[in-house]
Amino acid sequence: MIQELKNFRDREARRRKWKKFMVLQNPVIVQIAKEMPETPEELSCVKGMGTAKVEKFGNDILRILEKWK
C-alpha cells in the first residue's frame, strides 16, 4: 500500500511539475497507511494533510486505501 501511495505521489508530481514532497511527504504516506482513513474528514486529520491536499488528492488516496481493506 505504501508503495502504491508513493507511485500515486510520483505520478501527480510529474503531472503537475511539482517536487514529490509538495504532493505527499514520506512520513505523511506512512501515517495514512497506519491510520487507514475512510472519509475525507478522517484524511484531513492526518498530520500533513491540510484542506487543500485533501481537496486535490483525497478521493484518489481513499480509492487506493479502499483496495487494501
Q: At which residue positions do the language-model features occur?
A:
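Accessory DNA-binding and partner-docking regions appended to nucleic-acid-acting proteins
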Residues: 1-69
